[in-house]
């Protein structure tokens, strides 16, 4: 394992303290953490499954795998066999350990976007591999690479890759025998452009060989506190992950698996949450642009990627003086040093407070 970086949210604590001193209180737009209530149908399913004296199946209950496969088909137009679905104890742990679980190690390369969720870099470090930030995997050419991370819609900038872009990357990865993984945790939150799954037949030609897609229930279902996600795709890769996870004890608790079934079977709560986020996004974007920020990309996901042409840390401090906490773009790579990432996951009241302070 290579040395790990400092945990980014620890670095932000002094700015959080500064923002919290505002007379009207803190508006936390940094983390992107769900704040709306977990839907009753999910909580009821969890409560009904709390008599769980035995160990849960690492591969997931049949009901969970079938619900996930049905959700993929219904919402994303993707066909997978339920056996090619694997639950995760939240997708962050899966992302962090996936290269290592697939046998990646010293001398191997793990590629990820130049602007990226920090855990992609951590996944290379935990495997002892070399992390390679790229604007596009295609720039690697014939350079050997073991695992390639995509993130569409992306965090932090909210970019959505098109079908032709994804198709070209799939062909490139297959030519080199690289495992290609798309973190699709924001796929149900496309705004200006419709996100498409890596497993869509228009992208992969109907074959999932060498491909995996990772889906989080934290954002779509307000389940961050439950730690729940799924991975699907190439059955052989899913099988390899399952074997490691069985040995490591990476099983989702049985009550959480029951709640996941309820979440994946119900679309109504997702549409309600989309409406909430669409409203908050609109209010916040208008206020930011009125305050001189330029919002770039942000076509999908739960963040606005914004700049006023100044370094990110002074921008973070100025916003903290207004009682608004945001994430510095430098957390996501050198290419983000002129940007801040602003989440619209706070309550309507806190979003309104932020908008008022920006005007």
From Swiss-Prot:
NCBIfam families referenced in this protein's UniProt entry, alphabetically: DapC_actino
GO BP annotations, alphabetical order: antibiotic biosynthetic process
One Pfam assignment: Aminotran_1_2
Family, as annotated: Belongs to the class-I pyridoxal-phosphate-dependent aminotransferase family.
Superkingdom, natural source: Bacteria
Gene (name only): oxyQ
Plastid listed as a keyword: no
Protein name: 4-dedimethylamino-4-oxo-anhydrotetracycline transaminase OxyQ
Keywords: Aminotransferase, Antibiotic biosynthesis, Pyridoxal phosphate, Transferase
GO molecular function terms attached to this record: pyridoxal phosphate binding; transaminase activity
PROSITE patterns linked: AA_TRANSFER_CLASS_1
Binding-site residues, substrate: 32, 92, 155, 341
Stated role: Involved in the biosynthesis of the tetracycline antibiotic, oxytetracycline. Catalyzes the conversion of 4-dedimethylamino-4-oxoanhydrotetracycline to yield 4-amino-4-de(dimethylamino)anhydrotetracycline (4-amino-ATC).
Organism: Streptomyces rimosus
Entry cofactors: pyridoxal 5'-phosphate
EC number assigned by the record: 2.6.1.-
Pathway assigned to this chain's UniProt record: Antibiotic biosynthesis; oxytetracycline biosynthesis
Null allele phenotype: Cells lacking this gene are unable to produce the tetracycline intermediate anhydrotetracycline (ATC).
Residues modified to N6-(pyridoxal phosphate)lysine: 219
Binding sites annotated in the UniProt record for pyridoxal 5'-phosphate: 91-92, 155, 186, 216-218, 227
SUPFAM superfamilies given in the database record: PLP-dependent transferases (SSF53383)
